[in-house]
Each structure stands twice: as structure tokens, then as C-alpha cells.
């Protein structure tokens, strides 16, 4: 995966996480904020570390798009599940 494609996917994931945080209940807010922090940190580290290993690049980019789409439709639980899936695809 090239840097531009990764950046685009991370930006979609950050946007989806921001939407999930804004609509999360009090019980879900902490998990949503943790997910947002994870993707913001990944975005900030692109310059230093480059693109990390992604176990399935096509699944990662598709998941990013789907998460943003569902978050935009206020399907917050589904978007959260997709954010979690994307997180698992990124090797730490």
C-alpha cells in the first residue's frame, strides 16, 4: 500500500471515529474516544514511520470507506465494529 492510499484510508477512519464519538452514548464514549485516539496517532506517525504493515490492504481500504459511510448514516454500532476491524488489520 502506498503512502497516499494509506493516508486516505486513515483520514476516512479518523472522520468515521469523530462521527461515532459525536453520537456515542455516555457508556460508549470512552471506547469511541480510544478508537479516535488510535487512528489520530496512526495519522500523526505517517511522517516518522511511514506505512505500517497492513494484513489485508484491500480489506483495510474497504473497511475505512464502509465505516465512514455507516457513521454518516448514524449507524454507529456498525461503524464502531468496522473501526475495530480496521484497527486489527494494522500491525502495531
Regions found by a protein language model. Name each.
Residues 1-92:
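Long, charged/polar, soluble alpha-helical segments
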